[in-house]
Amino acid sequence: MDTPPGKSLAVSAETLYLVNLLLLPGVAFLVLLVLFLTRYRQAAPLAANHLAQTTGVSVVGGALLVSVILAIILLGGFDTGWTWVVVVLYFTFIHSTLILLGVLGLVRAMAGEHYRYPLLGRLFQP
């Protein structure tokens, strides 16, 4: 069984995406961004797909998490209990969804298949 070209880079991109969400937020994102900036242009189509998807969804997903939470806090009031209930529910739901989609992306990368993240992934087609 032959390994598709770019499979290891695709798996690395998806792994860094999950590490960014679960273990080292920010640090893993910077490593993923450097990997994208240095390897995307000459990457095989499989690797380019996973690099573009993980980097793009990390940027947009992170921006949406932060901006919506700030909007909820500003609109709901910093000292209101219900504001924090909504913030925790929103963060838990969106963060868990991003993790689940990242696991699906990792499975597809390990299988040597292309993957597009639902909703946000259309913006980052290679």
Language-model features: locations:
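Membrane-interface extramembranous regions at the lipid-water interface
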Residues: 1-21, 29-57, 103-126
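Hydrophobic alpha-helical transmembrane segments in multi-pass membrane proteins
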Residues: 9-30, 56-102
